[in-house]
Amino acid sequence: MFVYGDYLGDLKVTKLVRVWRTAALYEALRGKTEVLLKVAHPNDDCAERLKREALVLEALSPWQTGPAGFVRSFLPASRPVLPIIQAPYPNRSKRVHGEITFRGEPRVFSVLSFAKGKILSDLILENPQIWHYQAAWIVSTLAQALRPLVKSNKCHLSISPDIVLVDTDRDGNLRPILMDLGFIIDGGEVDGQYDWSRLSEPAYTAPELLAHTQARSIGLEADVYSLGIIFYEMLAGHPGFEAKLRRDEQVRDDVTQNRKPLPVGRPELEQAGVARVVERAIAPVGRFKDVLELSDALTAIYSAPPPERRTIPRRLYVLLATLGVVILGIGLVAGYLLLQVLLNNGR
């Protein structure tokens, strides 16, 4: 782990945000600019996962330069639901991830645009039973963040509250960012590729993945389970499967051997169909086919997350004022010329 003041190239580590199974997330400074720094653990599987994620994030990141970036700079920026990747080095690089040797050990890292907020698991500790509307909107937003993976028939397979950063907007609504894209693999590639018991959080991992079943049984519905169990935790006020002070093997056994629906314990939500959505999302079989279908089910009950009021960039006001002055100037010149023509004709 890195500590305050450590340098990774030109990046100064200022704060540890979270340690995950395959990487750690830090706040860092590049000069005077705040960024987020993700560093893979010194392991080939962890490094390859971060490299793969960096390529996907680059493909998904909005253009920051060129005509499209110039036009976008004048408009209110929508809040991203995925991290925006930045160049790994201060100079140009063909790679979107960085590689550097730190104290004799090769490390792979990526640099992300800074985002403020609290990790969802910390937020749940502060408020174990989040208002069910906000909980549903968080899950719906995370599902939409996974849309590019779903459309490519890729699985995340590592969703947990620890990889979600949540900020509160000016209206008090919770706005999440999915800070990690997971393994980004097809279900057919799952079998034997990774040690899931070591690289996944068993309390939030689909039982079929932990039970080492055949690869053909692993699909997009595995991520439905993870979002469903997070939704359950926010509604019920406690985890579906307690992981604190317990070994992974114990949690894994609880998940794979559970045969009973987990009770939400919220009678007021049953009539609206919320409990049925949760039950279907975390059922051993018969889940929603993917997270987008889960999002549709929640939207049918709660509607879509409310649009966020975003600050209008100052440069738009400057542009409008400049255009106003130019138009006024053109009008004055045109009026003066017209007046001169009329005076000359009157002579």
Enumerate the predicted regions with their spans:
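Conserved short submotifs of the Hanks-type protein kinase catalytic core
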Residues: 103-119
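ATP-binding glycine-rich loop module of kinase domains
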Residues: 29-59
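Activation segment signature within eukaryotic-like protein kinase domains
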Residues: 138-139
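Conserved activation segment of eukaryotic-like protein kinases, specifically the C-terminal portion
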Residues: 194-209
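Conserved catalytic-loop aspartate of Hanks-type protein kinases
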Residues: 223
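Conserved C-terminal C-lobe helix
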Residues: 269-282
